[in-house]
């Protein structure tokens, strides 16, 4: 109500960190409940932030949206297999730092599989900047709908979430220009991305 222009409010549906204790079938009611609460609250769209959840979890979250009548965006994370060089559906907090990684399947495969059930926007999220442009290219090659990107801004040290190797607004804008040139229509930021970096993205409208 206080905005000077029309805006849309997105409702974020999170994944689960310790789902293995319960099995995929136990998670569906949680997704259903999150979505119901957000829809009843009046959000304009739902964004499923599945991060690096196993493909079965991504599918379960997506199926929970089939009966709603507002737009749905789906976000997944991408990581690079250091042995093969392939982009994978998974997560790695930093390529340069020894942060560990989690891989499931080829990034191109999960995007292709998702596209068979989901025609709405698909985005790469919570990923190292160094893999984001490649992920956008694979999104473009495997999804006919809108694509986008909102990666992390740098590496964070546990347990304090102290961010290091932070990117400057100017450099973040330059990275985003690459995503847009490769087909991204939605751009933003995930962990470590603050107002200054988001503000820099506004310049994309003038280029």
Where do the language-model regions lie?
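Domain-level signal for soluble alpha/beta catalytic cores
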Residues: 1-207
């Amino acid at each position: 109500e206080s905005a000077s222009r029309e805006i849309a409010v997105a409702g974020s549906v999170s994944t689960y960190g310790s789902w293995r204790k319960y099995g995929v079938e136990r998670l569906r009611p949680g997704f259903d409940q999150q979505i119901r609460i957000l829809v009843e609250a009046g959000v304009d769209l739902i964004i499923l932030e599945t991060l690096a959840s196993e493909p079965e979890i991504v599918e379960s979250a997506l199926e929970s949206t089939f009966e709603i009548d507002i737009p749905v965006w789906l976000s997944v994370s991408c990581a690079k297999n250091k042995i093969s060089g392939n982009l994978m559906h998974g997560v790695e907090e930093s390529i340069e730092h020894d942060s560990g990684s989690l891989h499931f399947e080829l990034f191109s495969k999960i995007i292709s599989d998702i596209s068979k059930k989901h025609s709405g926007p698909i985005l790469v999220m919570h990923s190292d900047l160094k893999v984001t442009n490649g992920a956008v290219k694979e999104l473009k090659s495997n999804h006919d709908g809108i694509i986008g990107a909102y990666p992390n801004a740098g590496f964070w040290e546990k347990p304090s979430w102290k961010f290091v190797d932070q990117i400057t607004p100017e450099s973040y804008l330059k990275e985003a220009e690459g995503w847009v040139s490769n087909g991204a229509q939605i751009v933003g930021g995930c962990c470590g991305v603050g107002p200054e970096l988001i503000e820099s993205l506004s310049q994309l409208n003038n280029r």
